[in-house]
Amino acid sequence: MSESGSKSSQPLASKQEKDGTEKRGRGRPRKQPPVSPGTALVGSQKEPSEVPTPKRPRGRPKGSKNKGAAKTRKVTTAPGRKPRGRPKKLEKEEEEGISQESSEEEQ
């Protein structure tokens, strides 16, 4: 029974290839550009009436992930206000943290 099913699909596929218009593509079909009667006559020759503007990229640029900060901004907090966000580590604190880790490993 499965053999008859596969045989019947063969002729259908060949008919679709002959027509050329009936293709079963995946996803959304491409939008066909509107054909105006004036351009249909010229057809083979395109005249660039004006230079098309390139599309602007959206979102984050590709190479920006690994770059460091271009400007380092000094954070100055007003007296009496708490700084927002995670507190920044100072070099002294980093060294203390490293020495604490090594002392824990020794124990």
Curated annotation (Swiss-Prot):
InterPro entries: AT_hook_DNA-bd_motif (IPR017956), HMGA (IPR000116), HMGI/Y_DNA-bd_CS (IPR000637). The modification ADP-ribosylserine is found at S8, S9. The modification Symmetric dimethylarginine is found at R26. The modification N-acetylserine is found at S2. Residues 15-24 have a biased composition (Basic and acidic residues). One of its GO terms (molecular function) is D-loop DNA binding. The modification N6-acetyllysine is found at K7, K15. It is found in: Nucleus; Chromosome. Residues 1-13 have a biased composition (Polar residues). Residues 93-107 have a biased composition (Acidic residues). The modification Omega-N-methylarginine is found at R26, R58, R60. It comes from the Eukaryota. Residues 55-74 have a biased composition (Basic residues). Isoforms HMG-I and HMG-Y can be phosphorylated by HIPK2. Phosphorylation may modulate DNA-binding affinity. Residues 21-31, 53-63, 78-89 bind DNA. Residues 1-107 are annotated as: Disordered. The modification Asymmetric dimethylarginine is found at R26, R58, R60. The keyword Repeat applies. PANTHER family: HIGH MOBILITY GROUP PROTEIN HMG-I_HMG-Y, HIGH MOBILITY GROUP PROTEINS HMG-A AND C. Interacts with HIPK2. This is High mobility group protein HMG-I/HMG-Y.
